[in-house]
């Protein structure tokens, strides 16, 4: 049903890839190769990754799927701040969808996938639309699932983890709550004796200091940097200011960076 001589746009890659990612770990857990604690740790890690992605507030999951050709496979230094992964958020959405369907104790996401295969592929020889997918989820959940999709798939609203997970006696704990951790907003890499900025979080101290992606960080307060810049964050407190020496396009510059409280 697809013309592979040209791009095929869809807003459902989160289903093809995100749900697959969900079942990757779910299947191993079912086999007993992950303990309950290990499996919940994997979910928590994925949630942590998403919540630390500024792009989640800019791009919806459906939009991320649709723009895969021009965004996911053509990343820029702004991708971290403007896009969201349909693998990462898709996996979380699938987790929440399964839990929502299971709430009445009758059906689960397995039943949705089986029905899609039987009713659309086997009986009609075709795929399905988003509307049809929502319809099958509604049937299996025994309630209207459109609000779930409107909030989780088609918008950039914060995900309501508490409501979903509390139904199963689970809750999320912010391990940084109450802590004051200094943060520069830089994501850097270190190799061949050089520390280079890979990404910068939007609205961060690094942006205010005028630093840019690809800058080579040479020194902090006159001391040579050995390793990633963010590895030095723990040495400083919130509101501490440091002098950053860096190279850009062959020229040496200095900048004043004032650490902020980490939200990561």
Predicted regions and their residues:
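PDZ/PDZ-like groove recognition
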Residues: 171-208, 213
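Zinc-dependent metallopeptidase catalytic helix centered on the HExxH motif
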Residues: 1-55
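Conserved PDZ fold ligand-binding element
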Residues: 206-228
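Acidic/His metal-coordination segments adjacent to aromatic residues that form catalytic metal sites
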Residues: 2-6, 66-80
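Amphipathic alpha-helical substructures
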Residues: 40, 74-76, 80-166
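Solvent-exposed soluble domains appended to multi-pass membrane proteins
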Residues: 37, 62-63
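PDZ-domain C-terminal substructure recognizer with occasional recognition of PDZ-binding tails
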Residues: 212, 230-264
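Terminal peptide-recognition signature
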Residues: 20, 105-107, 149, 186, ...
């Amino acid at each position: 049903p697809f013309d592979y001589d040209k791009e095929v746009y869809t807003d459902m890659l989160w289903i093809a890839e995100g749900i697959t990612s969900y079942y990757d770990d779910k299947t191993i857990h079912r086999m007993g190769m992950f303990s309950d604690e290990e499996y919940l740790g994997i979910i928590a890690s994925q949630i942590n990754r998403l919540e630390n992605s500024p792009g989640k507030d800019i791009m919806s999951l459906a939009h991320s799927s649709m723009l895969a050709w021009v965004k996911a496979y053509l990343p820029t230094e702004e991708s971290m701040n403007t896009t969201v992964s349909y693998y990462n958020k898709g996996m979380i959405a699938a987790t929440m969808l399964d839990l929502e369907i299971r709430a009445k104790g009758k059906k689960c996401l397995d039943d949705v996938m089986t029905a899609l295969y039987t009713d659309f592929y086997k009986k009609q020889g075709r795929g399905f639309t988003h509307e049809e997918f929502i319809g099958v989820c509604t049937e299996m959940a025994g309630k209207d699932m459109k609000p779930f999709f409107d909030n989780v798939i088609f918008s950039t609203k914060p995900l309501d983890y508490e409501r979903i997970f509390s139904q199963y006696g689970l809750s999320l704990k912010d391990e940084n709550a109450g802590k004051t951790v200094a943060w520069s907003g830089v994501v850097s890499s270190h190799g061949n004796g050089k520390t280079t900025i890979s990404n910068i979080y939007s609205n961060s101290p690094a942006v205010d200091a005028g630093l840019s992606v690809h800058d080579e960080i040479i020194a902090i307060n006159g001391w040579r940097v050995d390793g990633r810049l963010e590895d030095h964050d723990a040495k400083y407190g919130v509101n501490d200011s440091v002098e950053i020496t860096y190279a850009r396009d062959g020229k040496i510059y200095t900048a004043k960076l004032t650490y902020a409280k980490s939200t990561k």
